Amino acid sequence: MDRTLESLQLVIARVLPHRDPALVFKDLNVVAILQEFWESKQKKKAVLPSEGIIVYESLSSLGPPFVSYVTLPGGSCFGNFQSCLSRAEARRDAAKVALINSLFNELPCRRITKEFIMESVQEAVSSTSGNLKDADDPSTSIGAYHYMLESNIGKTMLEFQELMIVFQLLHWNGSLKALRETKCSRQEVISYYSQCSLDEKMRSHMALDWIMKEQESPGIISQELQVALRELEEVRKAGHELRFYKEKKEILSLALSQIYSDEVTTSSWDNQMSLALHGYR
C-alpha cells in the first residue's frame, strides 16, 4: 500500500508539479484539482476543448443522502461513495473518487503490455474452464478477448474500459448473440464496433430493442431497471467505475419513457416510473 501511495505521489508531482502530493486528497477544492489534471492531459494530446469536458450530474432529491456522478473525458464515470448531507459534498466526494482512479490509471501497472495480456488471458481461461489454445482463435470467447487486448496494447485500463462498454452493453442487450446468428465472425464484430462511440443514436437503438422485448415479455423492462438501479448503487458505494450500470439505467428509462409517452400524461408517467422503481426502493 505504501509503495502504491508513493507511486501516486510521483504521478501527482509529474502531472501537477505545483501541487503538494501529500495534500491533494485533503484539499476541499478537489473539483478544481480534477479539472486541472484532465486539462493537463488533454493539452498533451492536443484534443478539441469539447472533448476534454468533465460533466457532473446530481440526482434530484428532496433531502440527504445526496448522489452525484462525474463523467470524465472519454466516458468513464464515478460517483460519491460516502453518505453526503449536501449536493456540494456529494460533488466533491465524486470528484475525489474520480481523481484517485485517474491518478491510479497513470501507473505503469495499469497499461496494457504483453505481460499483462498473458496474465489476463490465463486468468480468463481459469475462470471459464477454457483452453489456452483458444487464445489464438478469434472465433472463441477467449480468442476474442485476446484479440481485443492485443489491439489495444499501450492503452491504459480506463481507455480499454471505455472501449469495452459498447461490447458489454451489446452483450447485455442480446445484440451480440443476434450478430453471431447472422454468421458474423467475432473478429468482424470487434473491428466494426471498436470504431463506434456510445452516442444517443446507439442508446435509442438499444432502447428500441428493449421495447420489442417488452412486447414479448410484459414487465421485463421494469424488472431490468430495478436490477440496474441496485447494481448502480452497489458499484457507486464501492468506489468503482460505473458507466456500464449507469448506461443500462438510462437505456431502460428511455425505453419506458417511449412506451408511455403516447399513452399517458406527464403525471401518469411519473406514477408509472414510481411503480417501476418501487421494488428497488
UniProtKB/Swiss-Prot annotation:
Q: Which domain of life is it from?
A: Eukaryota
An annotated GO cellular component of this protein is:
cytoplasm
Q: Name one GO biological process term.
A: autophagosome maturation
Q: Which InterPro entries match?
A: Autophagy-related_EPG5, LIX1
Transmembrane annotation, as ranges: none
Q: Which Pfam families did the record assign?
A: LIX1
Q: Which family does it belong to?
A: Belongs to the LIX1 family.
Protein name from the UniProt record: Protein limb expression 1
Native species: Gallus gallus (Chicken)
Taxonomic lineage is: Eukaryota, Metazoa, Chordata, Craniata, Vertebrata
